[in-house]
């Protein structure tokens, strides 16, 4: 029995030794949730990080000669490997006091948040790639890190906004945490005290839900969003920028997302006011620096990534267009540009890095860099980095799992309205006229139409009298129930001070039978003297260039008592001296003389009876000559006329306002009332009303206008 027992013992010993000599693959450590959760609960990642490092290292051939591009490509196509690599990078890059373990241990909410982040390898990967600087110098150095404050900012968003945990809003949350307000370009008009990542997230979340951001915002990566949310402008200014531009001229937004064009509305001059807010920046004007600052701001307000650009003795703007391509605005080309994405780059390098980020190449290169950071042998590290792919070898559209649905931007015309207006209320007897209900429209402009007709952001139509217009006009047919004095108020939007419209009615002064003139521009009948007496402020009498002296004679058809006269030169302002006479028998007798005529020369004189009245132009201002008269009216009572002046306030610039009343004389019956704009910075008209002076303010509702 003793020998048999000894034999069995020897057999067991041999079997045990054999088993011990077999490979231990079934027992080898693999990345797993249990060990990760244990590290989070303990608030100590030392052991877990070491296990991750060892696991990653054993995936790489020990012999540098065996490290090939094919083998590295195979590793990078292994989702488990990439998740583990991103996790190891995430643990290693969080620093400061507390570190990742200390942060998780400090509060139960911290622990739950860290567990949520670390349970998603693709999320950690995107966070790390988003935080990675774009310039090659910083990437080679690889000393960048993430402090615990980033996690705290992100955690606040995570708990305050449950929708921030997936899709578009997750990308937005990551961007806000990584690039807090004020960490982008800092320039004129920026906030004195910066907002918080939580408030900035709420600002853009609300704007997106209200359909205030451009359609292409939905297609942005987290990295692209960092160049939106990092704006140094206040949240109040960002909201103002959207409302002001959507009100004043929404075509900038919804036609090709060209919001940077608004910066061109800044007058190129030293500002006349301090840059307290972005509205002050826009109104006060500025040279290249302030214009660049505003250009970056207004892009970011609408969700368009933008960066300030330095050029020789100049500043410009780089922005991402709706097709995903970066462009330069307000400056010269890329080859003279310098800009920064955490590190300084030339314009050419920036474009290369953007191109790289659009492909898997950026992620693959950084993954190999992270992997090399876990190795110790110099030859092994060099062999790994030698396999980095070229951009041309990379596949397009590197979309991670939490970026679903990135596609072409929706057509701007399908954009829903943000703020449908309440029903308009009109008092009995009040004449209410919508801007789009015009009978005549026109203008003389250096660029584009004198008056732009566009869709109002709140429904219906609006008119925009543009900055490049020398003069513009619009006529509205109205029916006046009773002759008398009416108060004209208008709903307008302006972004600069000093903006106004000239209003004019006809009918109180005499209808002129005919007119003759000393000269007509190129004998063009459409510019003949009759055009100055037709009660149409879109027509004019013009003389030939090179002439400063001439005359126009009016025939009233019969002798009439006259004591008042209006002469309108619009914006031409070419006359410096003139004389007005009336015919008494065969003689001309003077009524009055003057210098400038301008928009409205309104004269009252002792009554005389006359059938013929003559305006003589005696001298001009410019070398080219060629006076132009848009209207001449005479009578014994004035027509309604005057200026509608818009107020400017930094807090409400660009938003709708109702002007102070302008008293206008109207004559009962059908007529046309005219609104004209001089050369100025731009004004938008929504509607106007004419109320009999002294009438009741009782109102009734009008059906809402149709939405777009």
Residue ranges and their predicted role:
Residues 474, 478-495, 560-572, 615:
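A short beta-strand element within beta-rich, extracytoplasmic domains
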Residues 508, 544-550, 559-562, 569-639, ...:
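Trp- and acidic/polar-enriched beta-sheet ligand-binding modules for extracellular glycan
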Residues 481-483, 492-501, 570-576, 622, ...:
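Extended, low-complexity, turn-rich repeat/linker tracts enriched in Gly/Pro/Ser/Thr and Asp/Glu
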Residues 66, 81-82, 110-281:
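Secondary-structure boundary elements
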Residues 436-462, 507-559, 570-577, 593-596, ...:
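Disordered, acidic Ser/Thr/Pro-rich linker "stalks" and the adjacent N-terminal cap
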Residues 458-480, 498, 545-558, 657-660:
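Short beta-strands within extracellular/lumenal beta-sheet-rich domains
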Residues 272-279, 284, 289-374:
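Hydrophobic/aromatic-rich core segments of domains that either
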Residues 346-430, 643:
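Long, compositionally biased intrinsically disordered regions
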């Amino acid at each position: 029995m003793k020998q048999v027992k000894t034999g069995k013992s020897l057999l067991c010993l041999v079997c045990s030794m054999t088993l011990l000599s077999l490979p231990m693959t079934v027992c080898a450590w693999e990345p797993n949730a249990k060990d990760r959760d244990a590290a989070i609960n303990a608030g100590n990642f030392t052991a877990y990080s070491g296990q991750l490092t060892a696991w990653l290292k054993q995936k790489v051939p020990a012999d540098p000669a065996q490290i090939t591009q094919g083998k590295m490509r195979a590793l990078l196509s292994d989702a488990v490997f990439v998740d583990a690599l991103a996790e190891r990078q995430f643990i290693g890059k969080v620093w400061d006091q507390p570190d990742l373990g200390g942060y998780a241990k400090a509060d139960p909410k911290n622990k739950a948040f860290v567990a949520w982040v670390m349970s998603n390898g693709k999320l950690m990967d995107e966070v790390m790639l988003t935080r990675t600087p774009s310039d090659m110098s910083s990437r080679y150095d690889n000393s960048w890190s993430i402090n615990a404050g980033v996690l705290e900012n992100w955690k606040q968003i995570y708990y305050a906004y449950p929708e921030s945990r997936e899709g578009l809003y997750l990308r937005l949350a990551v961007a806000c945490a990584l690039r807090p307000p004020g960490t982008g370009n800092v320039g004129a008009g920026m906030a004195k005290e910066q907002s918080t990542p939580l408030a900035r997230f709420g600002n853009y979340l609300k704007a997106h839900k209200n359909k205030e951001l451009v359609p292409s915002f939905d297609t942005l990566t987290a990295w692209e969003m960092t160049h939106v949310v990092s704006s140094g402008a206040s949240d109040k200014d960002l909201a103002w920028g959207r409302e002001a531009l959507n009100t004043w001229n929404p075509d900038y937004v919804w036609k090709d997302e060209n919001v940077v064009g608004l910066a061109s509305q800044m007058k190129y001059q030293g500002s006349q006011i301090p840059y307290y807010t972005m509205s002050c920046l826009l109104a006060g004007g500025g040279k290249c620096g302030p214009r660049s600052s505003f250009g970056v701001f207004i892009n970011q307000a609408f969700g368009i990534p933008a960066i300030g650009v330095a050029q020789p003795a100049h500043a410009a703007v780089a922005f991402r267009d709706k097709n995903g391509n970066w462009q330069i605005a307000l400056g010269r080309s890329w080859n003279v540009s310098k800009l920064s994405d955490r590190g300084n780059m030339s314009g050419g390098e920036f474009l290369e890095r953007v191109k790289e980020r659009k492909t898997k190449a950026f992620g693959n290169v950084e993954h190999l860099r992270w992997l090399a950071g876990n190795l110790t042998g110099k030859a092994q590290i060099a062999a790994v980095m030698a396999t980095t792919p070229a951009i041309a070898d990379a596949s397009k559209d590197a979309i991670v799992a939490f970026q679903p649905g990135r596609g072409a931007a929706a057509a701007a015309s399908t954009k829903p309205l943000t703020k449908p207006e309440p029903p308009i209320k009109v008092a009995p007897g009040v004449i209410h006229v919508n801007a789009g209900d015009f009978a005549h429209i026109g203008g003389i402009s250096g660029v584009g139409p004198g008056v732009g007709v566009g869709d109002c952001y709140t429904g219906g139509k609006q008119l925009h009298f543009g900055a490049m217009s020398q003069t513009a006009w619009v006529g509205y047919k109205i029916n006046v129930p009773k002759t008398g004095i009416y108060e004209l108020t208008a709903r307008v939007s302006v972004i600069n001070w000093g903006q106004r419209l000239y209003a004019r009615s006809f009918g109180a002064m005499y209808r002129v039978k005919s007119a003759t003139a000393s000269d007509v521009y190129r004998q063009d009948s459409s510019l003949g003297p009759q055009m100055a007496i037709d009660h149409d402020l879109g027509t004019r009498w013009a003389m030939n260039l090179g002439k400063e002296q001439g005359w126009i004679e009016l025939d009233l058809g019969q002798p009439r008592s006259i004591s008042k006269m209006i002469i309108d030169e619009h914006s031409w302002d070419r006359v410096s001296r003139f004389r007005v006479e009336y015919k008494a028998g065969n003689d001309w007798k003077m009524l009055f003389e003057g210098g400038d005529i301008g928009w409205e020369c309104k004269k009252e004189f002792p009554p005389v009876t006359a059938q013929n009245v003559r305006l003589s132009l005696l001298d001009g201002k410019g070398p080219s000559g060629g006076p132009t008269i848009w209207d001449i009216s005479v009578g014994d009572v004035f027509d309604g006329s005057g200026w509608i002046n818009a107020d400017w306030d930094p807090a409400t610039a660009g938003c709708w306002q109702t002007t102070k009343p302008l008293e206008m004389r109207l004559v009962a019956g059908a007529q046309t009332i005219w609104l004209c704009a001089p050369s100025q910075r731009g004004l938008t008209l929504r509607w106007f009303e004419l109320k009999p002076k002294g009438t009741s303010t009782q109102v009734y509702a009008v059906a809402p206008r149709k939405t777009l």
